[in-house]
């Protein structure tokens, strides 16, 4: 779960928003959606993470979400039992476990192991990717684009998972 940003448009690091309720909600969505391990990538703010989740620090968090994604995938890569990564963001408070579970199931059912939530016509999170994609995603994850360059380059492999019946998928950039 990517939560390293400064939240400059929001006015504070979003990992601290609503006294940590967004963090709790995002971690609960991942646990409830079927993740066996939850890694929270921190940067601008150092805070406790919910019980059972693991905190990882992205030292280059100022570079953008790409740095956070690289840190999270590096941490996941150390687990030989991790076959998939479900990438979720802290600033999506209305995305819950049902959306995570739906995208995980879709990724597991595809040969490519790539699936992404869509809310109407808009791509969103979570994004689920099989381990075989992690190194290439990390190489292309720069700035605030995160996995987008890789997902665009491999668009034909990404399963679109409609989740607009479950959430808006809208990120919260302002208060």
Label the predicted regions.
Residues 91, 134-141:
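Short, glycine/charged-rich beta-strand-loop motifs at protein surfaces that mediate ligand recognition
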Residues 124-136:
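Conserved nucleotide-sugar donor-binding
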Residues 139-175:
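Conserved alpha/beta core of the MobA/IspD/sugar-nucleotide pyrophosphorylase nucleotidyltransferase superfamily
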Residues 2-123, 155-163:
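Nucleotide and nucleotide-moiety/phosphate-recognizing core
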Residues 17-19, 128-130, 172-173:
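Short beta-strand-to-turn element immediately C-terminal to the catalytic PLP-Schiff-base lysine
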Residues 92, 126-128, 170:
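A residue-level structural signature of the nucleotidyltransferase/glycosyltransferase Rossmann-like core
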């Amino acid at each position: 779960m990517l939560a390293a940003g400064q939240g400059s448009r929001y006015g504070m690091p979003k990992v601290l928003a609503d006294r940590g309720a967004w963090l709790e909600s995002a971690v609960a969505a991942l646990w409830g959606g079927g993740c066996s391990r939850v890694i929270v990538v921190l940067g601008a703010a150092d805070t406790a993470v919910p019980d059972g989740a693991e905190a990882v620090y992205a030292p280059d968090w100022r570079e953008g979400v790409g740095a956070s994604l690289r840190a999270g995938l590096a941490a996941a890569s150390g687990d030989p039992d991790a076959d998939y990564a479900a990438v979720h963001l802290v600033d999506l408070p209305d995305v819950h476990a049902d959306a995570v579970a739906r995208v995980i199931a879709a990724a597991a059912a595809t040969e490519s192991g790539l699936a992404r939530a869509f809310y109407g016509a808009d791509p969103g999170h979570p994004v689920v990717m099989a381990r075989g994609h992690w190194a290439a995603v990390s190489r292309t994850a720069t700035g605030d684009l995160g996995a987008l360059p890789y997902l665009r380059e491999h668009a034909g492999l990404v399963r679109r998972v409609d989740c607009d019946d479950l959430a808006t998928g809208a990120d919260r950039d302002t208060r």
